[in-house]
Swiss-Prot record:
The keyword Phosphoprotein does not apply. Gene3D superfamilies: 3.30.1390.10, Single helix bin (1.20.5.710). GO terms for biological process: translation. Forms part of the ribosomal stalk which helps the ribosome interact with GTP-bound translation factors. Is thus essential for accurate translation. CDD domains: Ribosomal_L7_L12. This is Large ribosomal subunit protein bL12. Homodimer. Part of the ribosomal stalk of the 50S ribosomal subunit. Forms a multimeric L10(L12)X complex, where L10 forms an elongated spine to which 2 to 4 L12 dimers bind in a sequential fashion. Binds GTP-bound translation factors. Disulfide bonds: none annotated. It comes from Rickettsia bellii (strain OSU 85-389).
């Protein structure tokens, strides 16, 4: 233990330049890098997620457009809401219509709403 205490004391007395030089020497001698591997893996994870295609979507009614009554009918059909609830949802646009749906279903909902005159976003 006495030897470790001496090493700790010597390392504590190093200047910043000397410590950096020591790190370089140890990296070369042991063939390692002082960079934290966790930081590298964490930085690579978001890139991998971005590369994977999104599977679940949220259909958002951006605006009802000019044919509000038609849009309310379609929203009622898609969501299973009553007429009053569907009207309220359309009036409060932008508002999510349906969440966690597969791409094909989201595209189908989007096309129905757009055919009724609404502006729709997939998120």
């Amino acid at each position: 233990m006495a030897d470790l205490a001496k090493i700790e004391e010597q390392l504590s007395s190093l200047t910043l330049m000397q410590a950096a030089e020591l790190v370089k020497m140890l990296e070369e001698k042991w063939g390692v890098s002082a960079a934290a591997p966790v930081a590298v893996a964490a930085a690579a994870a978001p890139a991998a997620e971005a590369a994977a295609e999104k599977t679940d979507f949220e259909v958002v009614l951006a605006s009802s457009g000019d044919k509000k009554v038609e849009v309310i009918k379609v929203v009622k059909e898609i969501t299973g809401l009553g007429l009053i609830e569907a009207k309220k949802l359309v009036d409060e646009a932008p508002k999510p219509i349906k969440s966690n749906v597969k791409k094909a279903e989201a595209e189908e909902i989007k096309s129905k709403l757009e055919a009724a005159g609404a502006k729709v976003e997939l998120k």
